[in-house]
Amino acid sequence: MMNRFRKWLYKPKRSDPQLLARFYYADEELNQVAAELDSLDGRKDPQRCTLLVSQFRSCQDNVLNIINQIMDECIPQDRAPRDFCVKFPEEIRHDNLAGQLWFGAECLAAGSIIMNRELESMAMRPLAKELTRSLEDVRGALRDQALRDLNTYTEKMREALRHFDVLFAEFELSYVSAMVPVKSPREYYVQQEVIVLFCETVERALDFGYLTQDMIDDYEPALMFSIPRLAIVCGLVVYADGPLNLDRKVEDMSELFRPFHTLLRKIRDLLQTLTEEELHTLERNLCISQDVEFPIRADVQGPAALAPALSAPLPPEGPLSAKAKDPDAELACSMQYDDQELEQLSRMVHRAGDEMSSLLSPPIACQSPAHRPGAEGSPGGEASPGRPRLRSGSDEEERVFFMDDVEGTAEALARPESPAGPFGWAGSTWADPQEKGQGGPGGAAGISLPASEKEEDLSNNNLEAEGTDGASLAGTSSCSCLDSRLHLDGWEVGADDAETAEMIAHRTGGMKLSATVIFNPKSPTSLDSAVATQEAASEPVAEGMDGGPHKLSTGATNCLLHSCVCCGSCGDSREDVVERLREKCSPGGVIGASYAAGLAKASDRAPERQEEAPPPSEDASNGREPKAPTSDKCLPHTSGSQVDTASGLQGEAGVAGQQEPEARELHAGSPSAHEAPQALSGSSSSTAGSCSSDKMGPEAAPAATHAAPQATREKIRSRFHGSHDLIHRLFVCISGVADQLQTNYASDLRSILKTLFEVMATKPETDDKEKLRKVTQTLRSAALEDCALCQETLSSSELAAKTRDGDFEDPPEWVPDEACGFCTACKAPFTVIRRKHHCRSCGKIFCSRCSSHSAPLPRYGQVKPVRVCTHCYMFHVTPFYSDKAGL
């Protein structure tokens, strides 16, 4: 009864501007909405329930904002520190955050659990309960004080506010940290490095003319796409020691680029092969906001291995020629991703994926022996005990665009599964060459082709070969991602392996395809590829001299010739092949470090394998070379270690002394030996291996080291059909990475670009300052001579300091009504209709038209807007026209 009487007697007015009075009515409104929400059945009237919940959240925001103002006024020196708020993302820091935290605390205190945050919810529940209790105590103390004295803050109320402020700050940090990632100081430092990289990129783009200063000053929307793309290029090749330094640990990279570490490494290797003009062409294409085409430049010649492929156009019936002639296949990633462009890009990517699948598996019309049943008499058709099988599962790695789909299969096929082969090659791989060569027409090693079909197949693939040796020679460029056990006399691979390749090709769509098509899988750097073996020259000669029916089908030959499209198996020129054979087969050759553990097992089996091979002199006299164990021509590296071939293994086991004379005899004596390198150099797909310096003789090491960069560059570039193809695929991959940042890291990228625009925007020059000073002087001349405020010399900062200290000035004296019969500004006489109005700023009398503005006057203690004249509003109230308040 006493409280009701006190409430009726001391209840503050609704129009009272004091904080306690405003809190009282805001709290009353919150209680009313809460009571109505409790009494409402949400199932009967869901719309009304939704409306009340929204209103309830709004009332909570209002109450907390007023409490925050009271704490600023009551305990300004005792506020809990909130420096951690700078680590919150921009979308979190808004005015409604306090209300959301209150709502979340009540839900947690009631027993609710944040979705996918069970552990964090259980850890925060005690704090949430304590926070809600403290908030109720604060509300009760403020309500009670509002009914007593609006101008007094008791010590009890101050203590309640301090306790609540500490709890609320602690809960804010815990709740936001559980919901969104909060950066550490190290991550902020790395992000600042990225900002510096972006600024340097824009500075370089301005110097080269890629961008204009007007685009930056106008905040051109296309820059949201152009700048990240250019930053990737600059970070990889121009400022290689910056935040995109791939030689550092992955953990030290910015979280923006950390998921793309593998892809960025391969992009960097390709960027390093570009000429300066090609780099400028790529950067210009990355800046434009329309579909781009990559013309073939006449001044930049492709590598020697690509000369025949570029000179002769592909026929329309070839699978790759259809891709090259299709304009959609050359569609570049545009910066403006509207629905139509996304649909076109999706169609193009899936079409390329279908073509990829056709490359990975032979055409149905020309079914290869790999898809034939194993009952046709071929030794490879049966499942040998040593045949490697695909493993059901592989180690989970950080995959970018699912690039490892293909390389995972290659690794699984290369892993040892039985003691029969220490390196995963066993069974029919080591079979007697005579057994393979005398299979007869009925063998399933391959199908013979008429001469016309052979010539047509060779011409379709731009292969310069003579006679019938070209069809069998095409098999020398087989690669691991297509078939781990391809032989020149047939495809000895199980149906499971081929089906797995088809499944991988079917999955390889979207940006996954671009990463798989362009780069050699599982290669630490594109400079280190696979190592060519002696079979590159020896086996084609054997097949050519044999003249047997063991020829690849048209589909198989077509697939093998273009195997570089799917795994990057590329080749050397004629001289490189012969030189590599000499260096590779030297007596001083050693095996790679990654396979050192297998040497012990291999050496135990070396005598048996040596007996299987016929003597080299006998084979040389017959025009045939001994069959070395068939191995992958483009076996990918793992963990940066060198991968040796089976011929190198045999040389280490004791046959290396015989291999060097054989290689030289092959080069000097046999006519077919000259055809093999020539055909290899003319094909668009040849071996991309590189011999490391430790496998060469001492006299050849310095020269090879000197020529290594240029040779490696040519090997990498030979994987592409030309400069335009390389630039186009780099454009697609770089755009894919940069545009992913817009989706995955929108907040960080927005913060980086915001800082970038603040730094790179045009600063006001001296001339602009002079113009501003002249305008200010002109406006000052319009000041009234009889205005006391215009004659003051106090600056705005001094007035602000006086206002902050609470030293309010006395309002000006009003001019008496009877002393003025005209408007001070327009001199219009006052009538019954045109009434008098006093300006609260200067105290003079004006008509309603000349005093139509309202503004607060903090220097006089007026917090709410009051009537002021036009002159005071323009020159004394708002700071837009002068740097002094006392004009």
Curated annotation (Swiss-Prot):
Disulfide bond sites: none
Compositionally skewed regions (Basic and acidic residues) per UniProt: 602-612
Post-translational note: Monoubiquitination at Lys-87 prevents binding to phosphatidylinositol 3-phosphate (PI3P) and localization to early endosome membranes.
GO molecular function, one term: zinc ion binding
SUPFAM superfamilies given in the database record: FYVE/PHD zinc finger
Localization in the cell: Cytoplasm, Cytosol; Early endosome membrane
Region (Disordered): 308-327, 354-396, 412-474, 599-714
Matching SMART domains: FYVE
Binding residues annotated for Zn(2+) 2, in chain numbering: C839, C842, C869, C872
Membrane-spanning intervals of the chain: none
Phenotype when changing C823A: Abolishes binding to phosphatidylinositol 3-phosphate (PI3P)
Cross-link Glycyl lysine isopeptide (Lys-Gly) (interchain with G-Cter in ubiquitin): residue positions: K87
Modified sites of kind Phosphoserine: S334, S586
Pfam families reported in the protein's UniProt record: FYVE
Cited CDD domains: FYVE_LST2 (cd15731)
Zinc finger (FYVE-type): 817-879
Phosphothreonine found at: T516, T870
Keywords attached to this entry: Cytoplasm, Endosome, Isopeptide bond, Membrane, Metal-binding, Phosphoprotein, Ubl conjugation, Zinc, Zinc-finger
BP GO terms, sorted: negative regulation of epidermal growth factor receptor signaling pathway; negative regulation of epidermal growth factor-activated receptor activity
Function comment: Negative regulator of epidermal growth factor receptor (EGFR) signaling. Acts by promoting EGFR degradation in endosomes when not monoubiquitinated.
Protein name, per record: Lateral signaling target protein 2 homolog
Source species of the chain: Homo sapiens
